[in-house]
Amino acid sequence: MGKKFSGVSQTMSRFRGWIQAGATLLTNLHLPNFLKGGLYQGAGKTVCVPGLNCYSCPAASGACPIGAFQAVVGSSKFSFSYYVTGVLILLGVLLGRFICGFLCPFGWFQELLHKIPTKKLSTRKLKPLRYLKYAVLLVMVFLLPAFLVNDVGMGDPFFCKYLCPQGVLEGAIPLSLANSGIRAALGSLFTWKFSILLAVIVLSVLFYRPFCKWLCPLGAFYALFNKVSLFQMKVDKNKCVSCGKCAKACKMDVDVTKTPNHPECIRCGMCIRACPTNAVCFRCGFGNGKENTTKINTEESK
């Protein structure tokens, strides 16, 4: 059944913001580089971080897994391609979208924007947009970089180059502010991506994590492992009173009592804090995250 962490679940969900801040700092340890306008190019850049964090960020401690994968997906002669693929699969199997909820810098950035006091809009009627991120993953991360390669077999990072707003936020903006030569070289591509960043910022104020829900290919990849990952959500049906408070609290539009490990669940723990009977918690173990469902279904059928 796996090991349950009821007390730890409450603590983790309560201090999630601090965990996100710590993860962002660890992902970007080289803060003085923001003033220097240079990049860290040490051994750490050969290691992929779990969340969406631009390689070109002056403070970046490691490589972005999506960017690294796009560069080498088109050729099996790069051993690095096997490493990146293996790391992504391992992270997915171990944590699933827990990474989105706790360890991703850009996810945290969107959440901070959403805290700005203004009218908030629901995304419940926009659920079909969820599938866009899978198209982005398939086309811009897998297919185009795999088939459109240069003479040495390296693909163009289409997602990073044409769509990723994190690259502008962490890379282009700070580097251009510190380097006049880079400022002079900015062109229409920067304008396009800066417009995307502005759109994400505005939407993040109104909607909860719109980029994560609709466009992020890394979230789409981890979502594929949500139902089979080692770290999961668990619902104790004997404790659940079907009050619906967990579903109402979920900003990812998931009903944890129906699908504890839905692909959209980022394991943020909002449902854990909302549950009046402590029926929801984190667990480590493989399975569907439900307990005593047979007994309940039998009783309900009487």
Sequence positions of predicted segments:
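Non-ligating segments of multi-cofactor redox enzymes
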Residues: 1-257, 263-302
